[in-house]
């Protein structure tokens, strides 16, 4: 039997981990299915360093956003967009992808337009609950429009966010919570850049609790903020190492989530999706300056279903947080975690990959031999 020729997927994603990591999840799965994967990104973006480490070849197009930029950059937009479109078309002609997957980032806009204009199939995925302008435009020319949250785009297919396989494979919340006793386990996640509001409020809130009321705290702060956080806890009368565990970065987020009874964190799209996939109770404090306040809407997907609590940063204080923590029990948090897990889309990676394969004309994404 003659083997079918190897097909090529081109992933367009860049700028932030929220775009890159779900793209990598799909890329790895399709490589396992026998596909060739090429990544289109910006040479100045994090993808230029991260993606090659995963064994995926890169193509580059220079294009950036306008937010926070000066008048000169805004006036140069037409020229920069034209240049990016020309570069994108050149890449498409050279790579000849069977399907292009747009996962977000500024680079997706010119490359997505050229994909559609060149007659190649475009699959678009929106990670947030509120789509940005670029994806709203590209959704009109894409073959399939996929969304992580319901109703993010008109006619979008709800697939969820592609996540790492180990997150979706975590032990069920009911079994995890039932094995525990003693103080609550609270994970505070500030992200790689740290979340100043959490780093300031949480230490003071914990200090307001009596010693027998205090949860076990693991606080991830970001490397640049770890010393300031240590000082915040010290000022609150708490000692790092003895009273709380402070870490600059967490390599194994699956275990960190699974070991927690409660996560206190921002509500970026991937954070919300990962917490739901593992099944853990969450107190979300949305980043107040996110575009279109999309973090509030992301968090609302779980909160509206009794799977999380949302507190706006302006309403977060040491006193209110301490009172809320004092009122929580492992049983109530376990119920919240169960509801969160029930809303997850654990097969999102496979679903997105299969849609890409289908759009490209494959009968099936994978076969027993790992070929198409």
Swiss-Prot record:
Transmembrane regions listed in the UniProt entry: none
Membrane topology: Peripheral membrane protein
GO CC terms, sorted: plasma membrane
Binding site for UDP-N-acetyl-alpha-D-glucosamine: 16-18, 128, 164, 192, 250, 295
Domain of life, source organism: Bacteria
InterPro entries, alphabetized: GlcNAc_MurG, Glyco_trans_28_C, GlycoTrans_28_N
Protein name in the entry: UDP-N-acetylglucosamine--N-acetylmuramyl-(pentapeptide) pyrophosphoryl-undecaprenol N-acetylglucosamine transferase
Catalysed reactions, semicolon-separated: di-trans,octa-cis-undecaprenyl diphospho-N-acetyl-alpha-D-muramoyl-L-alanyl-D-glutamyl-meso-2,6-diaminopimeloyl-D-alanyl-D-alanine + UDP-N-acetyl-alpha-D-glucosamine = di-trans,octa-cis-undecaprenyl diphospho-[N-acetyl-alpha-D-glucosaminyl-(1->4)]-N-acetyl-alpha-D-muramoyl-L-alanyl-D-glutamyl-meso-2,6-diaminopimeloyl-D-alanyl-D-alanine + UDP + H(+)
Function summary: Cell wall formation. Catalyzes the transfer of a GlcNAc subunit on undecaprenyl-pyrophosphoryl-MurNAc-pentapeptide (lipid intermediate I) to form undecaprenyl-pyrophosphoryl-MurNAc-(pentapeptide)GlcNAc (lipid intermediate II).
Organism lineage: Bacteria, Pseudomonadati, Pseudomonadota, Betaproteobacteria, Burkholderiales
């Amino acid at each position: 039997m003659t083997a079918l020729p190897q097909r090529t997927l081109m992933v367009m994603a860049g700028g932030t981990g929220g775009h890159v990591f779900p793209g990598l999840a799909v890329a790895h799965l399709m490589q396992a299915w026998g596909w060739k994967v090429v990544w289109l990104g910006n040479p100045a973006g994090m993808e230029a360093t991260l993606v090659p480490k995963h064994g995926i070849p890169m193509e580059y197009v220079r294009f950036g956003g306008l937010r926070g930029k000066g008048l000169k950059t805004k006036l140069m937009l037409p020229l920069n967009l034209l240049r990016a479109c020309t570069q994108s078309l050149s890449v498409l002609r050279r790579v000849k992808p069977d399907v292009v997957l747009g996962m977000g980032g500024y680079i997706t806009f010119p490359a997505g337009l050229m994909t559609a204009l060149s007659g190649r199939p475009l699959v678009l995925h929106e990670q947030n609950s509120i789509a940005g302008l670029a994806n709203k435009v590209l959704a009109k020319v894409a073959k399939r429009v996929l969304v992580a949250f319901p109703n993010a785009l008109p006619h979008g297919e709800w697939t969820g966010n592609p996540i790492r396989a180990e997150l979706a494979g975590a032990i069920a919340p009911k079994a995890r919570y039932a094995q525990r006793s003693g103080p609550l386990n609270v994970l505070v996640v500030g992200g790689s850049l740290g979340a100043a509001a959490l780093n300031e409020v949480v230490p003071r809130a914990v200090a307001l609790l009596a010693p027998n009321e205090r949860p076990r705290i693991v606080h991830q702060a970001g490397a640049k903020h770890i010393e300031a956080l240590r000082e915040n806890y010290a000022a609150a009368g708490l000692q790092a190492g003895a009273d709380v565990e402070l870490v600059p970065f967490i390599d194994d987020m699956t275990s960190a989530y699974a070991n927690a009874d409660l996560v206190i964190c921002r509500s970026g799209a991937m954070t919300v999706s990962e917490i739901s996939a593992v099944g853990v109770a969450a107190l979300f404090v949305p980043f107040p300056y996110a575009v279109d306040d999309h973090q509030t809407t992301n968090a609302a997907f779980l909160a509206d279903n009794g799977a999380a609590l949302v507190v706006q940063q302006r309403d977060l204080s040491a006193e209110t947080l301490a009172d809320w923590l004092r009122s929580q029990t492992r049983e109530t948090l376990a119920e919240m975690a169960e509801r969160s897990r029930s809303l997850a889309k654990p097969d999102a990676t496979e679903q997105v990959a299969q849609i890409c394969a289908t759009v490209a004309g494959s009968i099936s994404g994978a076969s027993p031999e790992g070929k198409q």
